[in-house]
């Protein structure tokens, strides 16, 4: 019986950290890899790559924990989130706080193996991860904070590899914010009706009937900024083809959200994994000359 309870608790932690749903980690991973490949340029040092890949998983898990902790009193009123570990009682508030601290400490121990500039930047990463979940109570633009949180690995990656944060770094950071606002608005469209009822704010609510148009503008902005990064770094045709393919995926997403149906909006959100992958493959093709 004791093992059964322990096993149930571990499964609850597993759900709380979303390790069964890797999409969030992947959306955090792709911009990190973009930055590492551009900063190097090419394949980054193996240890730095390993630190960032592990750090992505740990910080995404920590972000999920603090997000559910912040939303614990709201999630029970939303059909999609009512069975999450905190509102269902499978995990206590104290356990959630402890798990968050453990995950952050593990991530920080990894960062301590890197240079001083990266260590200093990691403090801002922690602040963004902690602040984001609470922003949806005070502003309709929490997705902007999410974009900054998901993109802060970009300046950290540049700092780790080159001890500098050049123009390309900040253009990529901005592109990631635009991309995150676009895909998280698609995600927020799924819960828009529930969010209005319980007082949660989001760009999906703010944009209203213009949501599809604004998402399209943001997606075009991502493509323009990523193309500018390619030009600044002298990347070859393979990279620009990847931007065109990403544009095709954005068009497909627009088709999916055309009628604002919940399942289709969620499918559009999930499709962004392929956008990140395609852009990374374009970078890899440009730097790896066979």
Swiss-Prot record:
One of its GO terms (cellular component) is plasma membrane. Pathway: Cofactor biosynthesis; ubiquinone biosynthesis. It comes from the Bacteria. Its cofactor is Mg(2+). Its EC number is 2.5.1.39. Belongs to the UbiA prenyltransferase family. This is 4-hydroxybenzoate octaprenyltransferase. It comes from Escherichia fergusonii (strain ATCC 35469 / DSM 13698 / CCUG 18766 / IAM 14443 / JCM 21226 / LMG 7866 / NBRC 102419 / NCTC 12128 / CDC 0568-73).
């Amino acid at each position: 019986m004791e093992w059964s309870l322990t096993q149930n608790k571990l499964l609850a932690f597993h759900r709380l950290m979303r390790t069964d749903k890797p999409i969030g980690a992947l959306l955090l991973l792709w911009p990190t890899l973009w930055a590492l490949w551009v900063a190097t340029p090419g394949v980054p040092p193996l240890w730095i790559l390993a630190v960032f890949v592990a750090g992505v998983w740990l910080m995404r898990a920590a972000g999920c924990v603090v997000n559910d902790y912040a939303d614990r009193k709201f999630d029970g009123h939303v059909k999609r989130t009512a069975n999450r570990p905190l509102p269902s009682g499978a995990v206590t508030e104290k356990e959630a706080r402890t798990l968050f601290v453990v995950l952050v400490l593990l991530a920080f121990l990894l960062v301590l193996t890197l240079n001083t500039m990266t260590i200093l930047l990691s403090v801002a990463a922690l602040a963004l991860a902690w602040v984001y979940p609470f922003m949806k109570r005070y502003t309709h633009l929490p997705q902007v904070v999410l974009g900054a949180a998901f993109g802060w690995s970009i300046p950290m990656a540049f700092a780790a590899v080159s001890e500098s944060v050049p123009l390309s770094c900040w253009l990529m950071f901005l592109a990631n914010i635009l991309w995150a606002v676009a895909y998280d608005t698609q995600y927020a469209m799924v819960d828009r009706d529930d969010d209005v009822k319980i007082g949660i704010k989001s760009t999906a609510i703010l944009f209203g009937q213009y949501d599809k148009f604004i998402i399209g503008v943001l997606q075009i902005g991502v493509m323009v900024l990523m193309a500018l990064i390619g030009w600044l770094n002298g990347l070859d045709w393979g990279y620009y083809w990847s931007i065109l393919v990403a544009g095709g995926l954005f068009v497909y997403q627009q088709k999916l959200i055309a009628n604002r149906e919940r399942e289709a909006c969620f499918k559009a959100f999930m499709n962004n994994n392929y956008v990140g992958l395609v852009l990374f493959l374009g970078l890899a093709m440009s730097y790896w000359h066979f």
